[in-house]
């Protein structure tokens, strides 16, 4: 009985540890506000090819992100979208703080093509340029954000 209890406790600890690691892989780096991390991940007027552009994000995450979209617009333009009518977020249906752009913007979507890469310097991506509408979730700014924008984008929910 004691070995079974001990084994089950170790399994539980391992499972909780793995869940913590998995959760941390999706978390933003603590030195950034949600709006700052949004800008790093999704705003670039002229992104280089995906493999190069994704290095910045992957260096903070310590792993190869499966996919990402860069909007070829300014942060101020995305902030303006936060002023559009609120809608239910298409991919996070529990959220009602999303807003859809009124105009298509050029974008660059990046897809990881070697998911087994063990080192972030080996992450390789396929480039998929396009022109689409986008949906962002917006929240009140963090005290660490610029007071210039009281409401800021914090999540790219969809491109349409």
UniProtKB/Swiss-Prot annotation:
InterPro entries according to UniProt: RNaseA (IPR001427), RNaseA-like_dom_sf (IPR036816), RNaseA_AS (IPR023411), RNaseA_domain (IPR023412)
Compartments it resides in: Secreted
UniProt keyword annotations, A-Z: Disulfide bond, Endonuclease, Glycoprotein, Hydrolase, Nitration, Nuclease, Secreted, Signal
Disulfide bond residue pairs: 50-110, 64-123, 82-138, 89-98
Entry EC no(s): 3.1.27.-
Signal peptide boundaries: 1-27
Pfam families assigned to the protein according to its UniProt record, in alphabetical order: RnaseA (PF00074)
Keyword Disulfide bond: yes
Binding site for substrate: 65-69
Domain of life, per lineage: Eukaryota
Function: Cytotoxin and helminthotoxin with low-efficiency ribonuclease activity. Possesses a wide variety of biological activities. Exhibits antibacterial activity.
Subunit structure as annotated in this protein's UniProt entry: Interacts with bacterial lipopolysaccharide (LPS) and lipoteichoic acid (LTA). In vitro interacts with phospholipid bilayers.
Protein name: Eosinophil cationic protein
The organism of origin for this protein: Pan troglodytes
């Amino acid at each position: 009985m004691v070995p079974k209890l001990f084994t089950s406790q170790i399994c539980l600890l391992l499972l909780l540890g793995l869940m913590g690691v998995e959760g941390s892989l999706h978390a933003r780096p603590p030195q950034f506000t949600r709006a700052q991390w949004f800008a790093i991940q999704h705003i670039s007027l002229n992104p280089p090819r995906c493999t190069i552009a994704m290095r910045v994000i992957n260096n903070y995450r310590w792993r190869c992100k499966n996919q990402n979209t860069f909007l070829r617009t300014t942060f101020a333009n995305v902030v303006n979208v936060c002023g559009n009518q609120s809608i239910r977020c298409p991919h996070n249906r529990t959220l009602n703080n999303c807003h859809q752009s009124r105009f298509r913007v050029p974008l660059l979507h990046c897809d990881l093509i070697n998911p087994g890469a063990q080192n972030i310097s080996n992450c390789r991506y396929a480039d998929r340029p396009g022109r689409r509408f986008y949906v962002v979730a917006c929240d009140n700014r963090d005290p660490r954000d610029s007071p210039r924008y009281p409401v800021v984008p914090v999540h790219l929910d969809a491109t349409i």
